[in-house]
Amino acid sequence: MPMSLAADAVQPSPDTPTIRRRDAVAPGSWPEGTLPLLARLYAARGAETPELALPKLGSLHAPELLTGIDAAVGLLVEAIANDKRILVVGDFDCDGATACAVGVRGLRMLGAQHVFHAVPNRMVHGYGLSPSLVEELAELRPDLLVTVDHGIACHAGVTAAKARGWQVLVTDHHLPGPQLPPADVIVDPNLDGDAFPSKSLAGVGVIFYVLMALRRQMRDAGVFADGKGPDLTTLLDLVAVGTVADLVALDPNNRALVSAGLRRLRAGQGCVGLRALIEASGRDAARLTATDIGFALGPRLNAAGRLEDMALGIALLLTEDPRQARDIAQTLEQINSERRAVQQSMTDDAEQALTRVVLDMAGQRPVAACLFDADWHPGVVGLVASKMKDRLHRPVIAFAPAEPGADTLRGSARSIPGLHIRDALALVDARHPGLIERFGGHAMAAGLSLRLDHIDDFKAAFVAVVLEMLDPAALQQQVLSDGELAADELDHRYADALRLAGPWGQGFPEPLFDGHFEVANWRVLKERHLKLELRLPGVPGTINAIHFGGWHGNAPGRHVHLAYRLACDDYRGGSAIQLIVEHCLPG
C-alpha cells in the first residue's frame, strides 16, 4: 500500500530512553496512617498536603471567572422562560458525547421543555458545526443552538446558523484562532484575556460550569420552589469520563471534578448507560479508577464516533432504560473490537513504513513523520499517530482519505514535550496560506484537513517548522521515575493503595518506578508481549512482570533496568503483584 512520510532528520537521539528520577519534595502534614509512599508521590507532583492532593468540590474555581458566562446564562434563562427550542450539538469523541449528555440532562433538570441534541458524523460532516450539518439541523427548527466541545473554530457553521436566524452559544475549550465565530456568546477558558485559572477544563467541564452558573442565577431569581434547584453533582459521572478520556491535564480543578465523579461511579450512582458500559467492559465498578476510564470506558464510547456514529454513544448516556443501555453497550463492545483490529492493521503498516525510512536514513530517525495510506480509516488515524509518536518519540501526523477515494485528507497529529503542535500547524498555515484547509487542537494533539495533492508540500513545510521550533534536546526521551521501591513495598497492599489513589492522569501522572532486576525466565505472548519472571534481593520467589508490546525480536539480558508500574495481578485473584513494564533497558 502506498505510504508517504517526512524523512528529514536532525541529530538523532538514541533509541534507548534515559530514566531520570524525580527530585525529592518533602511532603507536608498528612493524617496518621497515610502511607509515606503516597505522601511522597503526591508531593513530587506539587501536592504536598491533603488539600492539594485530594481537592474537594468546594475548592472549584468560581463560574463567574469565565468570560461570557453571564451572557450565556442570560441566553439560556430567556430560552427556558419562553419555552424556546434548544439544540445541543455535540462532537464525535468521548468529551463531546459526555458534554452533549450533560448539556441535555442539565437543561432538562433546570426546566427546559424543548431540548434536542445532534452530533456530526465524522464521515459525512467532518469535524464540528459545518454548514452542511446546519442545513440538516434546520428541520429541528431550533431557536437557540448550543455547541459543546467545539465551535471555536467553526466560523462557517456558526455563520450559517446565524443566517437562519438562530441564536448561537458556543461552549468550547479548544484554542481559538485569529478569527472568532460570529456567535451570540462564546464561553471558552482559552479565550484571550479569560480569567478562569484552569485552562485545562474539558469541553464537558465547560458546559457543566455553564449549568452551575445558570442554576445560581435561577436560584437567586427564586425560580425553584425548594430554594435550591436540582442537584447538578449527579452529572459528575459524565464529567469525569469526558475529562479523563480527553487527556486534559488533571490540575486541581479537574481532579476535584474527576474525584467526585469517580465516587459516584464506585457507589453505583452513575447514569444507567455508564453502569452498563462498566459491566460490558468487565470492570468492577466499586474499584473503578481514572485509568479504567481512559483505557476501558473512553475507548468504547470513542469507537462509535470513530467507525460508526457517536449518536449511538450519546443515546447510551441519555437512556434511562437498563435493557436498552445493555444492548447499546454490547453494540459498542463489538464496534470497539472492530476498531482494535483496524487499528492493529494500520499500526503494522505504519511500523513497516517507518522501519524502511530508518533503514534508508542509515539508522537515523526522522525529526517528524507524516504518514498516509489511501486505505486507512479516518476515524483511527489519531490512535495510529499516538502509537507511532510513542514508538519514535517524534511528532507524528497520520492522514487518511476523508472518505474512500476522496481528494481531501483528514489528519490527526500527536506531539512530544517541547513542540506545541497546534502552534506548529498555525505557523505552517501562516507561511503557506491555503495549504491547510482547516485545523485546530491543543499543545499535544491537533486535527487538520488538506487536499491530497498538497501532502508533499505540507510535509516539507511541517518538517521545516518542527526543525525551527523543536530543541534537539527534546528528541532525547526522558522517562521520569518516582524512584525505586523497597522490597517490602512490592506488595499488594501498596499496589491496591496506588490503584485507588489519584486520580492519576495527564499532568498528574500515575506513579512510575524503576529498579534493577535479575531475569529468571521470560517468554513471548501473542507474538507481541514480553512476559518476565524476575528476582530481587529481599523478595521471596519471583516477581511477575509484563511488557505489553515489548517484544521486538531481542531477548532480554540476564539483568535488566525496568521502568514499571506496580499493580495487582487480577488474573491471580488480586493477591499477587505484577509489574507493568513501560521500558526495559539493559541493567
Q: Model-derived features: where do they sit?
A:
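Histidine-centered active-site/metal-ligand motif
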Residues: 173-174, 377, 442, 529
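Mid-to-C-terminal polyanion-binding domains and interfaces
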Residues: 74, 78-82, 322-371, 405-407, ...
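A short acidic, amphipathic alpha-helical/loop segment
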Residues: 156-160, 369, 384-387, 493, ...
